Regions:
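Short hydrophobic core segments
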Residues: 141-153
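Dinucleotide-binding Rossmann-like beta1-alpha1 core, especially the glycine-rich loop
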Residues: 7-92
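Active-site substrate-recognition segment that forms the wall
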Residues: 1-3, 7-8, 13, 44-46, ...
Length: 199
């Protein structure tokens, strides 16, 4: 799932355009961590990429305008009239600043290579997992803790069966839009994220 994720760090969220939880603490940490990783690995994986927000409804525009004047340092009222040639903009546009795009494909590839000597690629059958007084055991590996990264399959994990999951499987469509600046993210009912080679 991560390989088709958009890799966007957005400091605001939801229909009410509120600041993402703990963003003032997490954003500087994330930026420093990604920049340190790219310097260490000599690759480019993080890029400041503002979000051009196309208001899909009057309600969303009103929420944006309210947050803009009250408590959101990440919003900018820039009205991008030029977006009208690419999007339906009857409710206007705005901008979210301090957003970042992470090249997840490069990041995962470099990260996998970096930990390759500490990495086991194998099929994990949860019935082989043994809980012990000290932690867990799987095959010949003994550890204090286990971290599940099951994605959508977590719904089938017996350790999480009591949680009320709502599946949210995203889809990616790769398109080329002639003339649309690849230096921004565009968000309305869908999100358009620049990838590579003007895609």
């Amino acid at each position: 799932a991560t390989s088709v994720a958009s890799g966007v760090i957005n400091p605001v969220t939801g229909r009410r355009i509120v600041q993402t939880w703990m963003i003032d603490t997490l954003l500087p940490f994330a930026i420093d961590a990604y920049k340190a990783f790219q310097q260490e690995e000599n690759i480019k994986i993080i890029k400041a990429t503002p979000i051009k927000l196309i208001h899909p409804s009057l309600q969303m525009k009103e929420s944006f305008d309210y947050r803009l004047t009250h408590d959101n340092i990440y919003l900018n009222e820039n009205n991008h009239s030029s977006l009208g040639q690419y999007f339906n903009t009857p409710f206007g546009t705005g901008e979210i600043d301090q957003c970042y795009w992470i090249d997840l494909i490069q990041f995962l590839k470099a990260g996998r290579e970096k930990i390759s000597t500490h990495f086991i690629e194998d099929y994990f059958d949860i019935s082989d997992l043994i809980l012990t007084e000290q932690g867990v055991q799987w095959k010949n590996i003994i550890a204090e803790k286990i971290i599940f990264c099951d994605g959508l399959n977590t719904m089938n994990n017996p350790y999480f069966k009591a949680l009320p999951f709502v599946p949210n499987k995203g889809e990616a469509l790769i398109v080329k839009i002639k003339g649309l600046a690849p230096t921004n993210i565009y968000k309305t009912n869908i999100t358009i994220v620049p990838w590579k080679d003007d895609l």
